[in-house]
Amino acid sequence: MPPNLLLLKRWLVGAGIIIVLLLLFREELPAVTDLRGRQVDRDGFVSRTEMMAVVREWQKRERIRKIVGLVFYHKRQQAAILDCYLKRDLAKNGGVLDQVIWLRQTDDARDVEFLDKLVRSEAHYSWRNQEGSDGSAYDGIQDDLLYIQIDSGIVYMEDGTILSMAHTRAMRPDFYLVSANVVNQPLSSWLHLSLGAVKPYLPDNETWAPVEAESGVMNWRPSRLPSWRGPPDFDVAKWNPPADRQHLWLPVTGKTDHLLHNTPIVHTVYDAYKDQGRWKWMAAAQQHYSLLENLERGELSKYKFHLWNYQELGMGTQLVAMTGKDINAAKPIGAAAERHFAVTMPRKIGRPAVADGRRVAAYYSSKDQSEGLGQTDILERYRSFAQEHVCKGRMLWTRNADHV
């Protein structure tokens, strides 16, 4: 047989096999119209419209009357930032929150005064005192509500974060608790490091924070910062911040390998209960600057995943969704409420605590990070970002407010 005919024969046999396989398995290949009907966004996740429809249908089916934000209020400096995000997420503004309850957990006079101002600024806000132990925060919880528990230290929420959490809870009744994808939590810090979201940053005592000359407002963009300059053998463990002012963390540039070498994040471990000492606040600083850089570059996709089951290892509860029925079934709730919800109850009832990785949020500071982070300009950078991109009108508190 001539070579050309032999090649043609082989080609026809191969094409025939492919056609047969396509016919056999055609039911598993979705049509273009099927893909279009799923309403996926550019990241490949379900669209906002479809998520909202699923949540509303779930509410009707399960008789969930409202979706309520339950905010654990501590400090006005952070809560003023969160306020902008919560107002954006109110149902009347296209979000899912029907109301927000601010739970006062401070006796500081200026914080209490600001809370009153905050609640008066929005008809769908209310507040109440917490009496007694941590468990008393859950007095008055109603079975037929979905609660979004929020720490007032949440200083960034990607648009659709709360909706995404509610959607996951609606789709997966086998989940006990659904968290957002939160930057600066013990286990998620290791996860974000592993996903490649954390950038190389090191502290600097010489450079002053950039401020816009006309407005006097800090520019949140890390691209405005100079590169970090220091000796190759710089030991961040022996470094101390300046005593008289805030300091910056600067991007380490010009390296092509070992990018994170000698930066605090490399000390992060997948263990929520291991004491990391001063590494904990320094790793937080590096993560916050990294998030701001990724926001500026439009690269939040670096953080994302669908679901992550923490396997009872101690997930943070700074931004979580729980039904009132599930909260009430967990009573009595003692002083260690976070561990009770994230570890004890999932272990007891066999329903896991998971993170919804489709939207990103940021938690500013735990108690053992607050002193160190308070010596940085990070909070003001988040304030500047929110004022520019989220707030409708001027933020209710700025750093000059206490000096008026």
What are these language model-derived features?
Residues 68-76:
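A conserved hydrophobic helix/loop-capping motif in glycosyltransferases and polysaccharide synthases
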Residues 144, 155, 159-171, 225, ...:
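Short alpha-helix within the catalytic core of nucleotide-sugar-dependent glycosyltransferases
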